[in-house]
Amino acid sequence: MDTPNKDDSIIRFSVSLQQNLLDELDNRIIKNGYSSRSELVRDMIREKLVEDNWVEDNPNDGSKIAVLVVIYDHHQRELNQRMIDIQHASGTHVLCTTHIHMDEHNCLETIILQGNSLEIQRLQLEIGGLRGVKFAKLTKASSFEYNE
């Protein structure tokens, strides 16, 4: 019979919060359909670990993955070409792009990137700063190991 690894077991601990923070936490649980406070707290911890992994690890190791979501006015002259030029000039690998037409004026592009964290963030800032770009959000990902 296998004995459970202590790292795999769920540990109960308590947290002290001000009432307004607890109320906000409970509102998010309901709004996002979590089954418990624990589920939301686990997700928040995982998100923070990914964020910290991006900051703490060697930023030049080239192993970071991110998704850049861009919404832009496709009528803006030469914007598509400038976005492509920035991607090609970057030291970041563009693994995949997806382009959709949201409406008569707006397009949404997702760009999956791999590279070092500084280059990926620089690419996001450059594209986000272009005239006609309405939204440029970078979602960071990490494949660090943790036990669930």
Curated annotation (Swiss-Prot):
Transmembrane feature ranges: none
Keywords: DNA-binding, Metal-binding, Nickel, Transcription, Transcription regulation
GO BP, one annotated term: response to nickel cation
CDD domains listed in its UniProt record: RHH_NikR_HicB-like
A Pfam family annotated for this UniProt entry: NikR_C
SUPFAM superfamilies listed in its UniProt record: ACT-like, Ribbon-helix-helix
Cofactor: Ni(2+)
UniProt binding sites for Ni(2+): H88, H99, H101, C107
Cofactor note: Binds 1 nickel ion per subunit.
One function term, GO molecular function aspect: DNA binding
Source domain of life: Bacteria
InterPro entries, alphabetized: Acetolactate_synth/TF_NikR_C, ACT-like_dom_sf, Arc_rbn_hlx_hlx, CopG, CopG/NikR_regulator, Ni_resp_reg_NikR, Ribbon_hlx_hlx, TF_NikR_Ni-bd_C
NCBIfam families, per the entry: PRK00630.1 (NF001884), PRK01002.1 (NF002169), PRK02967.1 (NF002815), PRK04460.1 (NF003381)
Role: Transcriptional regulator.
HAMAP family to which the protein is assigned, alphabetical: NikR
Quaternary state and interactors: Homotetramer.
Protein name, as recorded: Putative nickel-responsive regulator
Lineage: Bacteria, Pseudomonadati, Campylobacterota, Epsilonproteobacteria, Campylobacterales
